[in-house]
Swiss-Prot record:
Source species taxonomy: Eukaryota, Rhodophyta, Bangiophyceae, Cyanidiales, Cyanidiaceae
Function statement: Contributes to K(+)/H(+) antiport activity by supporting proton efflux to control proton extrusion and homeostasis in chloroplasts in a light-dependent manner to modulate photosynthesis. Prevents excessive induction of non-photochemical quenching (NPQ) under continuous-light conditions. Indirectly promotes efficient inorganic carbon uptake into chloroplasts.
Family affiliation: Belongs to the CemA family.
Record protein name field: Potassium/proton antiporter CemA
Keywords: Antiport, Chloroplast, Hydrogen ion transport, Ion transport, Membrane, Plastid, Plastid inner membrane, Potassium, Potassium transport, Transmembrane, Transmembrane helix, Transport
TM stretches of this protein: 59-79, 199-219, 236-256
Pfam families: CemA (PF03040)
Catalysed reactions, semicolon-separated: K(+)(in) + H(+)(out) = K(+)(out) + H(+)(in)
Membrane topology of the entry: Multi-pass membrane protein
Amino acid sequence: MKNWPLTTRSAFEKTGPIPRSISKTFEKLWKELDASAENEVMEEWRVARYQTVASLKYLLLLILIPVLVNQMSKSWIFGPLVDHVWSVNHADIFLNASQEERAFAQLQRFEERLHFDMLIGRLPTLSEEVIQQQIKNKALEIAYQYAQESAYAVKNVLADSASVASFLALMRFGKRQLSVFQSFVNEFIYGLSDTAKAFFIILFTDMFIGFHSPHGWEVLMEAVLRHFGLPENRDFIFLFIATFPVALDTVFKYWIFRYLNRVSPSAVATYHNMNE
């Protein structure tokens, strides 16, 4: 099977002046009238089965290998290395100003809550020395927490870089599997019904490009910046939200105009009807 010529062409390769749905109908009628149709159907089934199995295996490799590389390198290589450097060199607690602001706000809330609990009688009235000692203990706890967060961010950068390298290596040295996987994905997407295509298009656009998507992008950007220990600059986040979804919307509309409108015009019509 591995030496079979994969004659199953992707949907992109079948685009032309005649819509793909009409050409597939005529191809189906011609095959049903052909005397050797049964052998061809069995051969196509074997090729399709090989394509599906190979694509799923390759997809699992693309997911599992980078994840395993990330976790193993973080636990066994980068984790101990960063912890050693962090403890020996007494590195700074904070990597950026955003961490400082969150730490100071956390300490301030603790102090205010302490005074509030004493005022309402939830805690007995404490002396100034005891209050300062509790605040000091909380400050040390917060300092340790953010030192761990800073070290973890450095580990994330190194481990994620190793994951990206392993992912690119899989794509670089698995070109045949990648081409089979691309063909499988194209056939799967363009094999959906027009209603299903329109549904997923609307779901994608409303989720990533819709009027409510900026809130999701804001949360996502804050999480990504914090993951890598980068400053959570509000101006940068708002600039990203103002430009990236627009660029994504432009690419998506171009895809509809350039490919989907020729491959499946009925799906485009269904999409417009459902979107109205």
